[in-house]
């Protein structure tokens, strides 16, 4: 993952000394069998390895002379440098990230997945313990007299808008036709594949598209051998980007005389039970998908679900969904740069309970209490021990310039209630004084409520943070025209002219395979 570098800014002074902190971790060996995948995260083994990094500095935003201090006479460059001060330090504090991730395991209760356990559906699950949640599962149109014909191992996932994603497993040979049926019935135009077909000599996803340019038929059968319907899948074009390990396939899907154009993005640079070495190819993938969405015709199909899968459809898939949701929030955020003074937009970016986080000897029990209380309040989770936790708005307003901080440590039950009002949200205020929520913990929690195991490993959770930090660096560089220090894992790929739409990447390093005559895909 590279390293995170920071400039310590304390007590009104700026130190020239740069500390480099390597936050990369050793990857644990996967624990899995032929029929199941381990849902226990790698966090236990990762914690001990990460703990060996020693005590990491936890400088907090309020100790910076720039934080929430619009009267401080600084040039724009210095204001921008201070804008991501807290986020960098939050990522550096491994013990905080570990506690966040641990609390995810405790904050989501058991889910009802009985549909996937039914006898006629078990053969359709790639892993016996990765099943779709009943209340969010994708239900296919039923075929008369065919039991289980509405079942596929997939869930609708709400993100920036309802049903932004369909998260699913890598198709099996006996579910490929159902996969294309799901694509058709939901009018999906984009498929994201975050795995190779095989990894470590194990099949992770069966090929559901033609291997060569041309067409292939996938039929849906009824109760007997009668054909319920036939989907024609034609591979039109393949674009290979070996540098970023991204393959783009343009596919035509035809059913009952109607044809739709589908784009599949396969990212091969993300190994199973692991993370990419750099965020740049992954972020480029996200921008390419955004571009493609904006080009979809008819425009009414631009907000249909994006189908996302890896092998099990939880780890890499959940990490992707988290990053996309955060990117949407960044789009909103950067629109404010033209309308609002930079320091007013950026300074409240990652408001934290400062005093609680300043100590290197952090009380994880107390921190856990804060996190749980925050989630109970923001998500309406019933917590019998916290009936008085209903006044988060007062704390939230502190991020708009106030230096108020919560108590350092709860000493009794009464103090617990006061401290628990602190809402650990990383947010900014837009020009209408509305909070833009950047709470990554909350995003992952909501994803897990819709499909268990999303963002499966601690390393993946940390990768989400690193992706957003690198994206902030890159966008500020492009937007403001000056270089920020300590920009890691960012290459000079195409600079986009605005924050919501990027230009198509150069194909200088790509290989395009297509017929001699090819009409433009819609």
UniProtKB/Swiss-Prot annotation:
Stretches the record annotates as PTPase insert (Asn-rich): 327-426
Molecular function terms, GO-annotated: phosphatase activity; protein tyrosine phosphatase activity
Biased composition (Low complexity): 33-63, 382-410
Tissue expression as described in the entry: Expressed predominantly in anterior-like cells and to a lesser degree in prestalk cells.
Keywords linked to the UniProt accession: Cell membrane, Cytoplasm, Hydrolase, Membrane, Protein phosphatase
UniProt xrefs under PANTHER family: RECEPTOR-TYPE TYROSINE-PROTEIN PHOSPHATASE, TYROSINE-PROTEIN PHOSPHATASE 1
CDD domains assigned to the protein according to its UniProt record, in alphabetical order: PTPc
Principal localisation: cytoplasm
InterPro entries on file: Prot-tyrosine_phosphatase-like, Protein-Tyr_Phosphatase, PTP_cat, Tyr_Pase_AS, Tyr_Pase_cat, Tyr_Pase_dom
Organism: Dictyostelium discoideum (Social amoeba)
Role noted for this protein: May have a role in growth and in the early stages of development. Affects the timing of development.
Signal peptide region: none
Domain of life: Eukaryota
EC number: 3.1.3.48
Record's compositionally biased regions (Acidic residues): 411-420
Catalysed reactions, semicolon-separated: O-phospho-L-tyrosyl-[protein] + H2O = L-tyrosyl-[protein] + phosphate
Catalytic site positions: 310 (phosphocysteine intermediate)
Protein's name according to its UniProt entry: Tyrosine-protein phosphatase 1
Example of a GO biological process term: regulation of sorocarp development
Lineage of source species: Eukaryota, Amoebozoa, Evosea, Eumycetozoa, Dictyostelia
